[in-house]
Design a protein with these regions (language model features):
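Conserved short beta-strand elements that form part of the metal-binding/catalytic scaffold
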Residues: 9-11, 55-89, 134-138
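Active-site-adjacent scaffolding segments
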Residues: 2-12, 18, 73
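Vicinal oxygen chelate
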Residues: 1-4, 32, 37, 45-46, ...
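N-terminal beta-strand motif that seeds the catalytic metal site of vicinal oxygen chelate
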Residues: 10-58, 93-95, 140-173
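Short glycine-/small-residue-rich flexible loop motifs, especially phosphate/cofactor-binding loops
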Residues: 41, 67, 110
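Residues in well-ordered beta-strands of folded domains
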Residues: 25-27, 71, 80, 97
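Residue-level preference for beta-strand/loop junctions
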Residues: 18-20, 62-64, 90-92, 118
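Conserved beta-strand and immediately adjacent loop positions that scaffold enzyme active sites
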Residues: 23, 67, 122-123
């Protein structure tokens, strides 16, 4: 199902005991076809509280994932490989926010997610090697933006950064 904004939704009828109603789902298509399993294993290796829950392969293609799911920090995600031309690839229209309690966490997630061909962007944004967009954000941001006058200085600092530096934000505050 596609909504009026062009966002695709997959509706699944399941058991009543489902863990969460909305499950972010990655569809690996075109040049990314066949990378769903690799991506699931990569994300599970990056996040500390994570595991692959299930992987079901296509009977006629053991390299492609018909459906797989995995958890990251107790949140369920799904991944699939889709054959054929789909005319899209991952982009910044959808991103995942990782809230970090300190600079060590920011550095950890930034370095892991940009490894092996990922790309840095501005303001705490990055793309991993599968072109999935992430925002690596310090959990202190709401507090630093709560004072309207100081918020402008903090945002000016953020706009100059790729990876967020908490000490620099606190200095700007």
């Amino acid at each position: 199902v596609e909504d009026k904004f062009g966002l695709s939704w997959q509706l699944i009828l399941g058991e009543d005991n489902i863990k969460q109603k909305i499950i972010p789902s990655f569809l690996f298509v075109d040049k990314a076809y066949g990378k769903a399993e690799e991506a699931m294993k990569f994300y599970v290796s990056v996040f500390k509280n994570a595991k692959v829950e299930s992987i079901y392969k296509y009977p006629d293609n053991e390299k492609a994932v018909m459906y797989g799911d995995f958890t990251l920090e107790e949140k369920l995600f799904a991944a699939m490989d889709g054959a054929g031309e789909h005319g899209f690839k991952f982009n910044e229209a959808i991103s995942f926010v990782v809230n970090c309690d300190n600079q060590e966490e920011i550095d950890y997630y930034w370095n892991k997610l940009t490894s092996d061909g990922g790309a840095e962007s501005m303001c705490g944004w990055l793309r991993d090697k599968f072109r999935v967009s992430w925002q690596i954000v310090p959990s202190i941001i709401p507090a630093l933006l709560s004072d309207e006058e100081k918020a402008q200085k903090v945002m000016q600092a953020v706009l100059q950064m790729k990876k967020i530096n908490i000490a620099e934000l606190e200095k700007a505050y």
